[in-house]
Amino acid sequence: MTCCGCSGGCGSSCGGCGSSCGGCGSGCGGCGSNCGGCGSSCCKPVCCCKPVCCCVPVCSCSSCGGCGSSCGGCGSCGSSCGGCGSSCCKPVCCCVPVCSCSSCGGCKPCCCQSSCCKPCCSSGCGSSCCQSSCCKPCCCQSSCCKPCCCQSSCCKPCCSSGCGSSCCQSSCCKPCCCQSSCCKPCCCQSSCCKPCCCQSSCCKPCCCQSSCCKPCCSSGCGSSCCQDSC
C-alpha cells in the first residue's frame, strides 16, 4: 500500500498505514511544510487520506479521546466552509470559524462578513465589534467600534456626533427620538416616539387637546397653560 507523502511504501516517518487508512487517493498530494508535521499525538496515520493532506486530526485526541466514529470521521469540507487552503483563516479542513492567519492577528475570534474571515473594523477593536458570537456586519461609526443607533436591521450612525446612549431606545434598534439632527430628550407619549410637545427648542408642559400635542396658548406661558395632565 502506498502512503501519501511517503515514497517507497510506509516508513516510520509516516506513522505506518494500517487497514484503517483505507488507502490514499490521488487527491492527497502529500504533506506540505505548512502542516508542521504530525507527532505521536495524531489520531490517525500521518498524511493518510485527509483532505488537503495536512496533518490535523478532525478531532484532537484530548478532546475526543481518539478518532472514533463519534468524531464524525475526517470528512471533506463543504462549500459552507469556504474550502480549505493554506490561506484559510480556519484550521485545515476542520471548518471551525477561528482565525489563525496573519491578517487576523493570531488565533482570535473574527468579525466575519458572509463566510470570509476579515479583520475587525478597526485595529484594537474588541469583542464589541461583533454582534453576539455570530458573523454579522459590524456596528461601527467611522473606523471605531461603537454602539450604534440602528434603524430596522441596518446599522446607521447616531443622530449626531457625540450623541450618547439616550439617542437609542433600550438595546433594540429603533429610530431615535431626536429633534433636528441633534439628540435631545423628547416629549414622548407612552413608549412611542411622537412629535415633541415643545416650545421653541425646549421641552415644556403642553396644552394638549385630545391626544394631539399643540403649542401652548401663548409664548412663555408656564404650567398654568395646561389643565391637569390632559
From Swiss-Prot:
Region (14 X 4 AA repeats of C-C-X-P): 42-215
Record flagged with keyword Protein transport: no
Swiss-Prot/TrEMBL Sequence repeat ranges: 42-45, 48-51, 54-57, 88-91, 94-97, 116-119, 134-137, 144-147, 154-157, 172-175, 182-185, 192-195, 202-205, 212-215
Keywords carried by this UniProt record: Keratin, Repeat
Superkingdom of the organism of origin: Eukaryota
Tissue: Expressed during the active phases of the hair cycle in the medulla and the inner root sheath of the forming hair. Also expressed in the upper layers of the epidermis of skin.
GO cellular component term, pick one: intermediate filament
Protein's UniProt keywords contain Repeat: yes
Family from the record: Belongs to the KRTAP type 5 family.
Subunit structure, as described in the record: Interacts with hair keratins.
Function: In the hair cortex, hair keratin intermediate filaments are embedded in an interfilamentous matrix, consisting of hair keratin-associated protein (KRTAP), which are essential for the formation of a rigid and resistant hair shaft through their extensive disulfide bond cross-linking with abundant cysteine residues of hair keratins. The matrix proteins include the high-sulfur and high-glycine-tyrosine keratins.
Official protein name in the record: Keratin-associated protein 5-1
